[in-house]
Design a protein with these regions (language model features):
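Alpha/beta catalytic cores of nucleotide-metabolism and tRNA/nucleoside-modifying enzymes
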Residues: 2, 11, 26-31, 36-62, ...
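Polybasic, lysine-rich low-complexity intrinsically disordered segments
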Residues: 4-5, 23
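Intrinsic-disorder-associated, low-complexity terminal segments enriched in Asp/Asn/His/Tyr and depleted
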Residues: 8, 13-14, 18
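Glycine-rich, positively charged N-terminal anion/phosphate-binding segment
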Residues: 45-57, 66-139
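Active-site beta-loop-alpha junctions enriched in small/polar residues
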Residues: 66-68, 91-93, 125-127, 151-153, ...
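Conserved beta-strand positions in the central sheet of alpha/beta enzyme cores
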Residues: 87, 121-123, 147-149, 217, ...
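Alpha/beta enzyme core
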Residues: 137-146, 150-160, 171-249
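Short glycine-enriched, charge-decorated loop/helix-capping segments at active-site entrances
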Residues: 161-167, 227, 292-296
Length: 466
């Protein structure tokens, strides 16, 4: 075999001490196929940009990377309900590179399987280019791209110096992405948050792309928008980036996806290639169902989703899907458990890692309870999904029976409203008002939005999209 040679594209940039970060000498996106290896008998190149996107089917509906939540079983379920691309949970690059036990816990034989789990993007957090490359090499052949997490806003990311806490260190971000771009056999992508200043965000996005990122996902929240200050993602800044980046940029939008028709609206208003959902997907896997399909498929029965998901988990090898199961069950059943608090207590007692019989008991309880509901003579009048008037933000709120999966609207201004919501769910006959529908503030203009407290089920290790 002839001697292998590597050919790298050198991208020049000037590091500035200004807060806006590096100033690119070539601000337009530089997209050139890098030859990975070349010998007298063969050559190999990796797809980039639009060609890569088209090779995986031009996906439009994407499961976001979520810590301990976008694991294999959940990805399989989400694909059945319309997801066309999935990201893994965020993996810690140094641990993935150096700890066999960590890899075994996080990555199993079915992960990235061509028949079960593709297309797939594997996400890592990192602050060391060498560890990132070592980690990424473990998943070559089992994914379509590797993503760098530049969005995690949580305290653990601050302490570990990764995620959104690299946003001011453009030199390091460039080196992390470019290391994979020039030395890894699969493409690299990136997911970012925004700065308050849209021009600074645009320069940031250009730098990420020039480093070699083939897809750019923009989460329209700043690093500070978390916990009590979560608020809404700003679609206007996402659209500004889309309009001002090269048109051939493969561009995904993330944030504010509550219903299937929000995906259609986002694609149209922003002009993005695809829409990513995190929390919306966790509470209702049907969020990825086409908005033109039957409403009852867009908002599936909780007992049906629970049984389907549980059967998938039982089949999946490894521990990752089992560890995540309890959290998923709480989210899928959230509106149901507000009414049937006895079953909530049973869910809380489950040991999902070692005791499948605990889960089976809960699944059967939920199935029996929902069957009782559907045995009522007036079920056709009760099992109705209705939409309110069109709002200024372009969509409308939906009134969904509590036995169907639906988005979770966090209480606002410190008022939980749990009792009011529960009574509304029980009656299914009350009109939509600000008293029983606290989500009415969710789509206010950016400067009018109230602060929103954390999800009650969020643990110290955040389960949100990062």
């Amino acid at each position: 075999m002839g001697k292998k040679k590597s050919f790298n594209i050198i991208i020049l940039y000037h590091l500035s001490t200004h807060q806006s970060g590096p100033k690119l000498l070539f601000p337009s996106r530089l997209l050139t196929l890098r030859t990975l290896s070349r010998s007298s008998s063969s050559s190999m190149t990796k797809l980039q940009g639009r060609e890569l996107y088209e090779s995986i089917g031009s996906p439009k509906r994407i499961v976001a990377p979520m810590v301990d939540q976008s694991e294999l079983a959940w990805r399989i379920l989400s694909r059945r309900y319309g997801a066309t691309l999935c990201y893994t949970p965020m993996f810690h690059a140094r641990l993935f590179a150096t700890s066999e036990k960590y890899r075994q816990d996080m990555w199993g034989e079915w992960d990235g399987d061509a028949g079960k789990d593709r297309p797939l993007v594997v996400q890592f957090c990192a602050n060391d280019p060498e560890y990132l490359l070592q980690a990424a090499k473990h998943v070559v052949g089992k994914c379509d791209a590797v993503d760098l997490n530049l969005g995690c806003p949580q305290g653990i990311a601050r302490k570990g110096n990764y995620g959104s806490f690299l946003m001011e260190n453009w030199d390091l971000i460039y080196r992390l992405i470019n290391k994979l771009h020039t030395e890894l056999d699969v493409p690299v992508t990136a997911k970012i948050r925004v700065f308050e200043d849209r021009e600074k965000t645009l320069e940031y996005a250009k730098m990420v792309l020039s480093a070699g990122a083939q897809f750019l996902t923009v989460h329209g929240r700043t690093r500070e928008m978390k916990g009590q200050k979560t608020g809404l993602a700003d679609w206007s800044i996402i659209k500004y980036l889309r309009d001002n980046l090269p048109q051939d940029t493969v561009f995904f939008a993330n944030g504010n996806i509550l219903y299937p028709d929000d995906i259609s609206r986002c694609l149209t208003e922003i002009g993005c290639d695809a829409v990513m959902s995190a929390e919306g997907n966790l509470y209702n896997p049907g969020v990825f169902v086409d908005a033109e399909e039957d409403l009852k498929r867009q908002f599936p029965r909780v007992d049906h989703i629970l049984r389907e998901y549980y059967e998938i988990v039982k089949d999946c090898p490894g521990n990752a899907s089992k560890i995540a199961m309890k959290s998923h069950i709480f989210k899928v059943l959230r509106p149901f458990l507000e009414v049937h608090t006895d079953i909530r207590q049973e869910v809380a007692k489950m040991n999902t890692k070692y005791r499948f019989d605990d889960v089976e008991r809960v699944v059967k309880l939920v199935e029996a309870t929902v069957e009782e509901i559907f045995a009522k003579p007036d079920i056709e009048q009760l099992d109705v999904i209705t939409a309110g008037d069109k709002q200024l933000w372009g969509g409308s709120y939906k009134k969904v029976p509590y036995w169907r999966c639906q988005p979770y609207f966090r209480p606002v201004n410190g008022v939980s409203g749990d009792k009011r919501v529960t009574e509304a769910l029980k009656s299914q006959n009350e009109p939509l008002t600000s008293q029983n529908e606290p989500q009415l503030s969710n789509h206010l203009p950016h400067n009018k939005r109230p602060l929103q407290p954390d999800n009650e089920e969020q643990t110290k290790r955040s389960k949100q999209s990062i």
